[in-house]
Amino acid sequence: PWLSQTNHGKGYIAINETPWDSKYTIDHDDRGTRLQFVWLTSLGKMRYKRVVRYSFESNMDYNRACKIYREYVKETGLFKSLKEKEVNLNKISELQQCAVVHTGIKAHTEKDSRFYSGQKDVIHSFDSVKEMIQKLHSLGSFKLYLHLDGWGDSGYDNCHPDYLPACIEAGGWNGLESLQKSLSTQNDLFGLHDQYRDYYYTAKTHNENEAIQLEDGSVLEHANWAGGRQNYLCASLAPKYVKRNYTEILKHIDLDCVYLDVFSCNEMDECFNPEHLMTRKECMEYRRACFQFMINRGIIPSSEECSDWAMRELVFSHYGPYEFMMKEENAKRMGIAV
C-alpha cells in the first residue's frame, strides 16, 4: 500500500502504515491525475491513529521508490525471502523450475448464476488429465506444476466450503490419488484450487449466521459466480473449515501446493455479527492463519495477487499484476506495474 509521484527526478513515496481500514481513489482525466488515500471506519468507529509515511528525495524514480519500500518492509517484519520460506517448504526450489499447467475437472453452473445460459456440465476425468501431463512430457516438457480447478464433486466455484469428496464422475478419490501419484513419479508438482470466502447456499452446512453481517444487520448476497446464490463466509470461521477439509483431503493424497482463491486480492471484510465480530485487521490475520496451516504441513501456499500483508506466508501468486485481468486483452495498460 504505497504511492509515489515524481517530477524531473524529484519526488516522494507515501507508505500507508495503517492500511487495514483504508482505500485509495484515482481520478485520471484531461485535467491530470489525482490520487488519494481514504480512511474508513472500523466497526463503525475511527478507532486508532492513521499514519502515512512520506519520504522525499531529489533523486526519485520508481526504482528508488521500490527500494525505499523494500527497506521499509524489512524494518517492519513484513519481508520474508524465499530462502527463509524454504526452511519449512523444501520444494520451493523445485517450483521455480516448473512450467505451470492450469486445467480443470468439472464445470457446473447453477441456474441462478449470472453466468447460466443453459449450458451443460463439462467433466474431464482425472485419468484424462494424467494422460495429458504424460503427453506433455513425451513432447519434451520438463518439470511441470499442475494447478487443478474444479476437482471437488460439485465443480469449480460451487458449494464452498462443502465441495468434498473428489469429483465422483471424474474418478473420485481413487482417480485423484492416481493422478497425484503419477505426477509424483514424474517429479512434477501438484496443487489444488480452493476457496474460503464465497459461501454458497448450496453448501450442505451453509448457515447464514456464519456469513459476513453488515452494520445494519443485513447479510450481503449475490449470484455472480458459477455456484449461484451466495454470501461471504466470515474469515474468523475460515480456519475451521480449512482444517476440516484438509484433514480429509490429506488422508487420500499428498499435496505440494494449495491455491486459496481471492484471499490476497479481494478487500478485507469486517463482520458485525456479535457471535463472531471481526475487524478488517483481524480478517487479515485469519486469512494468514489459513496460509500458515498449509505451511505447517509442508504445503506451499499461493493466492491471487501479491499483497504485502501476505508475503510472510505466500510463495507465489497467479494474477500479479491483477490490473491486466480487468480489461480487454489489447487495451492500453495503465502505468508501470512495480
Language-model features: where?
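Carbohydrate-recognition beta-sandwich/jelly-roll modules
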Residues: P1-Y145, W151, N158, I168-A170, ...
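Alpha-helix boundary/N-cap detector
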Residues: E57-M60, R64, L237, E282-E285
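Alpha-helix-loop-beta-strand connector modules within alpha/beta enzyme cores
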Residues: L179, M284-M294
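Aromatic-lined carbohydrate-binding/catalytic grooves of carbohydrate-active enzymes
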Residues: N90-K243, K251-V258, S264-H276
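Catalytic metal-binding/acid-base residues of hydrolase active sites
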Residues: F263-S264, S307
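Glycan-recognition surfaces
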Residues: H8, Y199-K240, Q292-V338
